[in-house]
UniProtKB/Swiss-Prot annotation:
GO biological process annotation, one example: intracellular sodium ion homeostasis
One Gene Ontology MF term: protein homodimerization activity
Protein name: Calcineurin B homologous protein 3
Domain EF-hand: 110-145
Subcellular location: Nucleus; Cytoplasm; Membrane; Cell membrane
Membrane topology: Lipid-anchor
Protein family per UniProt: Belongs to the calcineurin regulatory subunit family. CHP subfamily.
Keyword Ion transport: no
One Pfam entry name: EF-hand_6
Gene: Tesc
Amino acid sequence: MGAAHSASEEVRELEGKTGFSSDQIEQLHRRFKQLSGDQPTIRKENFNNVPDLELNPIRSKIVRAFFDNRNLRKGSSGLADEINFEDFLTIMSYFRPIDTTLGEEQVELSRKEKLKFLFHMYDSDSDGRITLEEYRNVVEELLSGNPHIEKESARSIADGAMMEAASVCVGQMEPDQVYEGITFEDFLKIWQGIDIETKMHIRFLNMETIALCH
């Protein structure tokens, strides 16, 4: 009786922290146990057995995001060696559809949280800025599966996108002015008016039994 009460209290606490329902938490817990091999924590190598990740060109960045202390709200840099179920839920909550019944301020806060998660995937050195080199790395990874696009072409695409970002965020630049990279404030400007919902989903975890959209 006491154990059952304690478990339900824990679920309610997780509901409050992540926004998932008790049914969703139960289903995600089954998936967590499947990934971890029934262990209390997950390590990076546990993601090697996720079929939907195998062919994803930015697989390494997706997996890394699960262990990024910034996303886990445990610090401003560094990676965790392993994550527990609550950590797993924290990361999964970034992919949860925004509840549009919330107030405007809360909806905007949820959107910013999602964009911060994406920003961290680009900002690999945790310095608060996406440099040209970091952006090139992402574009090269994204296009690595396309045999018709050479590395130099991928770099040109990244360079062009960075120039466009500079024009959006800084405006007209002087000939000798150097754009040092995209800050999170810049990132918000770039994503203004873009539907973040269509860019972030959880199919890569192959959760065929889970319906996160109601």
